[in-house]
Amino acid sequence: SAIVYFLGPVERVHAMVDTREAGTSRYSGSPAMITWKHTQGERYGSWEIVDAPDLLIRTGYYSADEWVEITGTRGILWVTRCSGDLLGEAPIILCRDGEVRRYHDMAVDWGDSFVRGAHEFTRAIQGGYQPDLDAREARHVLAFSLAAMKSGLERCEVSVEP
């Protein structure tokens, strides 16, 4: 949903995924490369998934690390923390106008995001207002995910249903 939140709806997606047994009963979608085009403007994205079982990652959860990089015409924004803290960097880094700014003063624990999301949803119901992620956007995020899975299985580009 961060992809849609930052850059808007996705038009089409292409995924290259190696599916193999991981352990006794689960399948892994790693390694993988997923690319997509947003519906508005010249906005493209990619998501690389790599299995690195021997890589030490600081985390209070599971040994995975995710981050987001958004490159625009005037700068780059990095969100360096989701479930892990591989880089030990500020959670938000902005490179713009020849300067790099690091933003540290924020709650970044992965578990806190679920608590804040649940509180936001409850307040929206009680207060009668729309939460940040509405039903239409949630359905689009699901459609994007399903299209990526279909693309990986069928080995072709897939349009994301509106």
At which residue positions do the language-model features occur?
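Short secondary-structure transition/capping segments
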Residues: S25-R26, P91, S145-L146
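Contiguous beta-strand/loop segments that form the cofactor/metal-binding neighborhood of enzyme cores
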Residues: S1-G84, G111, V115-G127, E161
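Short polybasic amphipathic segments
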Residues: V68, G84-E99
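A short, ordered amphipathic alpha-helix with a cationic face
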Residues: D109-G111, R136
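C-terminal "lid/loop" region of Rossmann-like NAD(P)-dependent oxidoreductases
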Residues: R101-D109
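C-terminal helix-rich "cap/oligomerization" subdomain common to oxidoreductases
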Residues: E120-P162
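A short alpha-helix capping/helix-coil boundary motif
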Residues: G98-R101, Q126-G128
